[in-house]
Amino acid sequence: MTISTLSDWTGEVGTVTIGATKADGGTRSGTVTIGGERDLAFIGNPPTGNRPLIAYELCDDPSLWPAPVIRFLGDRASDPAEWARFAAGEYRPDLIRLYLTSTRKRGFSAFAAITTTVENILQATGLPLIIEGSNDPELDSEVFRRIGEAGEGERLLIGTAEAGRYRSIAASAMAFGHLVIAQSPIDINLAKQLNILLREIGLPHDRIVIDPYTGALGYGFEYSYSVMERIRTAALKGDDDLAMPMISSAIDSLTVKEVREADPSASDRTSVAWELYAMLPATVAGASIVCVRHPSTIQPLKAAIEALWSPPGGGA
Amino acid sequence: MPTVTFLPGFRKTELPSGSTILQAAQQAGIHMNVVCGGLGKCGKCTVYVKSGRYDFDREKYGKFFTPEELEAGACLACQTSVLGDVRVLIPEESIVQEQKILIDVMGTTTELNPAVWKYALRLSPPSLDDPSPDLTRLLWGIEKSGGPNEGDIYAPLEVIRRIPRVLRESGWRVTATVVLVPGGYRLVDIERGDTTPACYGAAVDLGTTTIVVFIRNLIDGSIMGVASNYNRQISCGEDILSRVTFARKGGLKKLQALAAESINAAITEAANNAGIDRDHIYEVVVAGNTIMTHILMGIDPAYMIEEPYVPVVRRYLTAAASRAGLEVGENSGLFIFPAVSDFIGGDIIADILASGMAEQEDISLLIDIGTNFEVVLGNRDWMFACAGAAGPALEGGEVLFGMRANAGAIEQISLDLETFTPAYRTIQHTKPKGICGSGLIDLLAELLRACIIDRTGRINTAIEHERIRSGRQVPEFVVAWKGETGIGKDIVITENDVKALIMSKASILAACRTLMKQAGITHAEIARIYFSGAFGNYISKENAITIGLIPEVPVERIFPIGNGAIEGANLVLLNRRKKRFLDEIARKIAYIELNAEPSFMDEYTGSCFLPHTDLSLFPTVEEMLEKCRLRRGVP
Amino acid sequence: MALKALDIYKLLPKKNCKECGEPTCLTFAMKLASGKVKPEDCPYLDENVREILGASTRPPVQRVKLGVGERSFAVGDEIVQFRHEKTFFHEPGIMTAVSDLMDPDSIQAVVADVRDHLLVRIGLDLRLNGIAVWSASGSPDAFATAVEAVEAVAELPEVLMAEDPAVQEAGLAVCGNYRPLIHAATGDQYREMCALAVKHGCPLAIRAPDLDALAGLSGLCTAEGVSHLVLDLTSPSLHDMLNQATAVRQQAITRTAPALGYPVFLDTRPCGLPDAALICGVLKYGSVLVADPLSEASRKALLVLRQNIYTDPQKPIQITPGIYRVGSPGPDAPVLLTVNFSLTYFTLQGYLEASGTDSFMLIVDTEGLSVLTSVAAGKLSETLVRDSLKEFAVPDLVKHRTLIIPGYAAPLSGKIEDETGWKVLVGPRDAADIAEFLEKEWT
Ligand code: SF4
Ligand code: FES
């Protein structure tokens, strides 16, 4: 076949490895590597780089979590370790992403609990972990220090650095050997700026995963989709400050009107559809990690990613 | 007491022995550069002592000078005490130009081709042999003196009425004045005797806030007088939009009268200073923004500020000056610069003319900065222009201790990159009261170099230093301690100030980049950047580039043109041949509406970073910042 | 490749004669570069230049229209590979499949459902587009009967999926006047299929084992007089569909393989992952998508995704300015000001609803610009706020005089207070923090 895709790209997305096994000084049962693409997502025979991965999201304070998930999980949602064990065992995501939502309550001061929660999750699953800390500059330095310390050696991916508050999280990542999610509000320039800021305070590019912020389907998703495409093409054109893998999570998917108001009998199906129809496009736009909250989304999403990844004859 | 004589002007002053030369200069009313405030740190107050007894520590301050300079008597004025009579040469670099409103004695040379001629005539009285009428006699006289053909000169009734008396009372020795207007030659005055040397014109910059007037001698082109003054329309609204609103509510007449009044006042002041009669001003050339010139001509500007934003007139306008209420010679001409759109007015056309960019093959970028900014990109074949709002930050507005370029404003500042100690210079060398635009640009660049702010303008509060503190709401940096200021409190720059400045500079840079993109031009292809506007002359080119206010080009390609509007008006006044060229310029310009340009917002966010998100656009700045970071070590 | 304004300008006569309706040749060049005028509008271009300009400004993907009447739709006319480069112009048509093995009643039920299904979002009607009739039986009669069943219920655009020319002809005999898409010509029977397409004036889908063969076939079909082609890239492999559709789009817009400058047809059934295939089809260059009937959840998500992707990224969707209520606010409820950029509106509305605070949203007209942009562009100003308060009679709605403005509008707070006399509270920058903000500040 002579007519094929035109791949005259010169750049390459950097690779990032998350998690550490015993051999690397951690306790994970395996590690995952993302990035490395030299073309658009899924393009090429075989595609370049690494297959996009699925992270399953959970939290330590379910009162701020979408209702359809809590309904689906029942009691399991009250214990993050149990939650993680269940999701990892039954649904087989590639990573677990824990939100320390407890830190977002007003007047939070239970810093010791952070250490315990992180340790418990580390024990509950052997999957590589993503940990989301506080989003209050007042708490950040203590929270991220705790996370960093509790997960020392595990090569966690921790979030979320923003242009307004990136120093504490970067400091923790540098001190304890972790990776950082750098989030900017749906804008390629802002994404790049944050990466430069992080580089300038000493966090190397291979420790950064870009989160371009993802709007829910129907609520600005198209902006995120295009920003991801732009970031990816910029990287392929050789812009080193944008050549990091991306993580995408449409965190509002399960609270949008369409899902909230869905008929109870269709609640799960609607939840899955809303997550699938945002996260599969995110992988096509170039995201290396896509995140879901409804356990039932994992299987169809995984099947779709595999079908997109495998050239015919390459096995599914 | 010793006497200090300043060369080259021989200005003298007496003061007690032991005083510094700097003090002597201040006493003599000479404004010297004292960037470091007279601490002997900046080396900007260089003088050469030519003779007399004085004391200066050559060992300590020798590093500022070359051996040749020391040989020639170089000293730092602030560190040299006078012990007896001395003669001191102040090199031009050490003198601060007068601040206030920018009045620039034009640098551009042009041929002298005014549109006004005066003819001193000795006519023979009529007789029975020679009974031709007075007017014919006069016009014949003009023709014989080398003027236009008798048949080509139009004489208005008011002038004709005066002819018989003036001719006879003067014993047939008169001076006739002829002006070339678009319709042809026009006899505008007849006077007794020979008044040919009294031939003047006025160039006017009609700005929204200020008005500047130059009176020029049209015989030799020399400057007779200069005056400036606030636009009295300010009483009807601070900014341009409120003026239009005022005009809409039936206030057009009043605004027109105020515009004329403001110009008249400035003309009168300049004429009085020069000791000339306003009636001898035969032509007035006005450059102003589109709304201002519409108002001056009494044309309703209301439709310009609503979609689709069309001005009533685009091409140049002429009329008798008296019809606009200008108090100059009764029949004198008035010439109004053409405009491109409501946003690109005659002031910008004047900028373009003054810069000379419309005559060059190389591509130039012209930037006029005020609360609103205009940018023009192009050469003699094509031009793109756009306009937008930069916000008042760069003029000192919306910045906590920002101020206009008045006495007491810090207009230049540098930081010691180790100790963060500022060295600054204020306008008129009084104690600092605030910081003006050029000072803010310096400050931003220095804060960045010192790694006190990151590229988004956030102050790094992790640095422990007395000048960096958390402030009431946001972090701030102390520029001057209470004791050293003229306002009794610390002068600071807050993180919000820095952000406002970044947003302002970003809109300007984004506008430049949008035009460049539209034309497909890279930084390297820009042969010249012209800077016009209030602070254009005082701004540090390096720092303007460091913060990304303008695209990076080698600094020698940057030319401040000061007040381009008044310069352009002067050029047209002195050389009438430029008039036709103005319409040509105006026609060549393609106006780009930034709000309709989808890439503008992208350029804007890209520019909200110091200097820009695409670091490769500012290679030397990057190199410099890299060094600064290395020196400080990674925090 | 697209030419820049200045490149075009260099080719123009530079007479500035205004005959094209533009003030200068340069403005004409700018408009030509952005496709707002045609080269023909300037009478002074020589043939050569017109050719160059025409070739570089004509859309590289052929426009093709399916169906007639109200529900007909056009695809193609695309000019970019990524939507952020400009926009995608024509949404793919989603064609629900029925087979001629189904009994007419079931067919009609499907058709009626497609006809009536409607989702209204942001003031726009989102619909499925048409029916693909699949010849599973191979019998011309059965096919004709199925097509008749479809026709009996609704005038919807159709795809007639029958590769046997005889079967195809039977279907066309029923609905050939209504511009169905003929599916599909192959190397073996393209002459007959082309003849049918010419006879009925219908667009024709073509299918070949690989892209080279497809380009060849496309040439053969145009030689037969069919210029409204659609390229069938269906494959059991999702990976292949994505790769081939990407290749076709790249080749078309770079004009390296003009024979591939046609819209793409994808049948999502063979790959066994209907949702995934539809998603890829919407994202990556499908123009006609065939699918089995979907669950309501998938259907909604699909229509919304398609709307999202085909929204012009340069023209934000706007909300009509005015007062909007969240819950049932009373005279003490907070008034939150924001801009009429739809995303901003929906985001704030979502969080306000979630916060459970009854409130008023005052939406002012910033021409669809976001808060940050409209502040920067001077579109959001104190006078606009003042006029909007008045226009929407906000003082009559509430007893208090406090206005909550978005965090990014903070620089305007003083001016708004001066201009309106209202007290201004600067809200959070991120709508997600609104609940917390209200809890703290609004008691
Ligand atoms: S018609 Fe042609 S020559 Fe005349 S102005 Fe338009 S582009 Fe220029
Ligand atoms: S060295 Fe004299 S003023 Fe700075």
Please describe what each predicted stretch is.
Chain A
Residues S78-T101:
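Catalytic domains of carbohydrate-active enzymes, especially glycoside hydrolases
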Residues Y99, F108, P128-L139, G153-Y166, ...:
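Catalytic beta/alpha-barrel core
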Residues G107-E132, R145-G153, E229-M244, A307-A316:
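Alpha-helix-loop-beta-strand connector modules within alpha/beta enzyme cores
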Residues R51-E57, D94-R97, P128-I130, R155-L157, ...:
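Structural preference for beta-strand elements that scaffold enzyme active sites
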Residues G164-I305:
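Catalytic alpha/beta core domains of metabolic enzymes, predominantly
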Residues M1-G74:
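N-terminal amphipathic alpha-helix/helix-capping segment at the start of soluble metabolic enzymes
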Residues I3, L53-E82, R106-A110, P137, ...:
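Active-site mouth loops of central-metabolism enzymes
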